[in-house]
């Protein structure tokens, strides 16, 4: 660890981990990549896809690793579900419903989608071994109506295989809930 990011840019450091407020991810990751460092960034990787694409381009150009902290993909339960899906035990997957809600910790610099949904999105893509081709989302802020950041978001994803996924994330639910339901033909 270091209080000064300059300490991390010298030649004795091969890689950096960025676990700072989201608004700083892009600047710090770009600086590290340009200094020829492999980078792991806590989720979400950046504030928007344009910034993420730029970081990915720099990493590819410099042959560096750029990783995001999607740690749930390595959870034994998620790995077990992946094996069950791949084995065909559930048959053809029709749809997936995912919920990640809790009360509190409203973020000041990102919306609930960027805070909570990256976990579920990475899990979905890992389980299905594909990325969505269509995404729609709607959200709102109820507590802090002056904020530009949603506190509740509903997303629908459609995959090329025809699988649908619904995702609900919220900072306002009175009971913490983490659930994923996978519906298949068996």
What are these regions (language model features)?
Residues 103-164, 170-175, 181:
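Rossmann-like dinucleotide-binding domain that binds NAD(P)(H)
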Residues 3-6, 100, 140:
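Conserved SAM/SAH-binding loop
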Residues 46-108:
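A contiguous active-site-proximal alpha/beta segment in oxidoreductase catalytic domains
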């Amino acid at each position: 660890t270091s209080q000064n990011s300059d300490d991390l840019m010298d030649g004795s450091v091969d890689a950096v981990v960025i676990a700072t407020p989201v608004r700083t991810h892009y600047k710090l990751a770009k600086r590290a990549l340009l200094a020829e460092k492999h980078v792991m960034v806590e989720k979400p990787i950046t504030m928007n896809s344009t910034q993420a694409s730029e970081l990915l381009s720099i990493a590819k150009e410099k042959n560096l690793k750029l990783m995001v902290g999607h740690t749930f993909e390595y959870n034994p339960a998620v790995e077990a579900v992946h094996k069950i899906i791949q084995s065909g035990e559930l048959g053809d997957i029709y749809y997936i419903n995912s919920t990640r809600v809790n009360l509190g910790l409203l973020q000041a610099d990102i919306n609930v989608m960027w805070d909570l949904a990256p976990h579920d999105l990475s899990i979905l893509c890992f389980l299905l071994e594909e990325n969505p081709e269509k995404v729609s989302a709607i959200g709102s802020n109820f507590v802090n109506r002056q904020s530009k950041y949603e506190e509740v978001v509903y997303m629908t994803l459609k995959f090329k295989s025809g699988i649908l996924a619904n995702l609900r994330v919220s900072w306002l639910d009175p009971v913490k809930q983490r659930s994923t339901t996978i519906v298949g033909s068996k």
